[in-house]
Amino acid sequence: MKFLVTGGTGFIGKRVVAQLLQRNIDVIATDINTDKEKNDFEDYLSTKNVSSKNLELLELDISSKDDLKKIFRNYTITNIIACGYQMSNLIDSNPIKGAEVNIVGMTNLFQAVMDNKIHRMVFPSSQSVYGTTSEIFGNKPIHEDDYCGLQHQLFTYAVMKLLNEFMAQKYVSMHNVSIACTRPSVVFGYGRKRSSLMWAEEFATNPALG
């Protein structure tokens, strides 16, 4: 069993990698620029007391079909956890790059699941796909099967996540592959350095740090 974790040096990705290594699972962690985050990534793993003997850290641009083909040609990958994604602030500053990674890149991974007979792919979508929730739902709880449309969306990020979900459903129904997604809410914790949600990070960590 060997897991490919895209965005593996990122805020969520490195936590996923650590948990896999703790279970003695072989991991290929990739990111578009591993040099930039390598020190923080290695420091984080050291705090979790996990061995890196089952880990390979590689550079990968998921928007490049050639890069992906090379990975799957060189390694026997059984599962994919796709954490590599452009956040709202990066999408707004460079929409073309955002679309290349978030739409083309994710679709490349769905295709790779089919082409390489991957056991299962999992990716985080977002609770933001529900749109401006108070306007739509009022104070009632939101359920997983509640409607997610475009007319109440504020963020390109959420619309891209909706498209990812739609494409994943197409691959599942048309090609009988196993792709699952989650819809996490705001993800915060120590170590986040850049995000449009830094307010959540500061709200949680500043009181603890004094």
Task: Please place each PLM-identified region on the residue numbering.
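SDR active-site strand-loop-helix element
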Residues: 6, 30, 80-86, 121-127, ...
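Conserved glycine-rich Rossmann-like NAD(P)H-binding loop of the short-chain dehydrogenase/reductase
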Residues: 25-37
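Rossmann-fold cofactor-recognition segment
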Residues: 48-64
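NAD(P)H-binding glycine-rich loop region in Rossmannoid oxidoreductase-like domains
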Residues: 62-101
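Conserved Rossmann-fold NAD(P)-dependent oxidoreductase catalytic core, especially the SDR/UDP-sugar
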Residues: 107-155
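NAD(P)-dependent short-chain dehydrogenase/reductase
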Residues: 135-137, 166-210
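Active-site helix of classical SDR
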Residues: 156, 160
